[in-house]
Amino acid sequence: MPRYGMIDFDYAGRLANCPPDEDGPVFMVNYMNYRERADYGDGSDGGRSGREADDEYAPVDVLDDIGAVVAYFGDVIDDQTSTGWHRIGIVQYPTRRSFIEMQSRRDFRDKHTHKEAGMDHTIVFGVPVHLVRSASEAGHADRVVFDLVRHERGLGTPAPQQATGPVEGTIMGDGRTWTELRISWLGAGDDLPPLDDVDDRERVVVRTSIDRIRTLVAAADGAHGTPGS
């Protein structure tokens, strides 16, 4: 069992056993918090900080091999919760099953040692790509706001420069349940979006390194014949 979170085995089972005709691309979204120093379990930090251990983990070659794509990656510059998040990462997997099958690959398990050493706690959850609704194409974004929220109403219409998607399950977390991910692309003078309609939330403001979200959502919309805006 990993030290950095609780596995939802019910959701893991749904990912592994999703019928092929119902399966398809899924965003696996990672909220990440690192140890100050890596902990390899033998009293050694490997000469790395927690963040550096996670950099060593980065399984880019494995993702390429299974047809997965890094959809987003960035550093948190304003954490508006008490959780202390450091990074946000999103990977689009071609299917839910491919995410589960990756866990048993030897090359992935070898790299995962570094994630185990570097990660203090994380939330990892799935959002079906074809169900993400995206408003009109955003202009230049100085920062991106990620709001992981829980509420009792249905998925709303995204505001301008925003995308929203339903959370279908949380594979790794702290036991809380989430219903929606909201992503807002903001210019330098834009205010943070309101959050007065939610029961729980994890909000972070992020400086982007990689952002392919809207391109991947548009491709999924085209494949399903359902516009995302």
Residue ranges: model-predicted function:
Residues S98-F99, F108-K111, K115:
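A generic structural signal for short hydrophobic patches within well-formed alpha-helices
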Residues M1-H86, P94-E101, D120-S229:
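Short S/T/G/P-rich N-terminal loop/turn motif that feeds into the first structured element of a domain
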Residues S104-R105:
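Short coil/turn segments at secondary-structure boundaries
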